[in-house]
Amino acid sequence: MFKYKPKLLVIRIALRYKEGYLLPEDKYDANNHGRYNKYLRSKSKEVKEDLDSLIKLLKIIYKNDLVGYMWKLRYDCYKQFYYQLMIFLDGDKCSKDIAIAKDICGLWKDIVTQGNGECTNFNAYKKPHTNLGLGLRYADERELVIQDAKIFIEHDYFVSSMLSGKQQRTFSKSHIPGETRSGRPSKFQKIIDTHYL
């Protein structure tokens, strides 16, 4: 992406749900293994739809500034399904990474999940020796960005085994060249116009 923009604003957030929101009524045991896995597969589709909704909103709000993004679906017994999301904005036009990440977290919590979501803004917790690839980065700092992005290629065996053969991705990246496309307005445009802009 540095080929398109020599300066990028790199944002990383974790998108999840409030505790208990994705949990089934019955806890897992050996007798309900199949039913539990079916429930988890249906929930994985729901969280993917929410991620798609957020990305559509980002394409509207940052249509001239969004250079690309990548996401990774993860699962653990406490957070249930959640997404790691890394966003790349044009560094010549955007510089306030913490504020932008906070706004994106607000979109996730208030609009996409209608109050059922939670979000971690990693840009707000940058420390001197961690998350060095976040914030405003130049082309000669690409290795720092790569180090921060390595979490996206770590294999999650539980998620991939549960979704195998289901034609559902656990990782994806998108590259958005600087040109804007014309087309019919998104259903989210009205929401953005009335709530966020």
Name each region found by the language model.
Residues 23-24, 80-84, 97-99:
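A short acidic (Asp/Glu
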Residues 68-92:
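Histidine-centered divalent-metal-coordination microenvironment in nucleic-acid enzymes
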Residues 1-3, 29-32, 91-197:
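Catalytic "initiation/cleavage/transfer" segments centered on a nucleophilic residue
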Residues 19-21, 90-93:
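A generic structural motif
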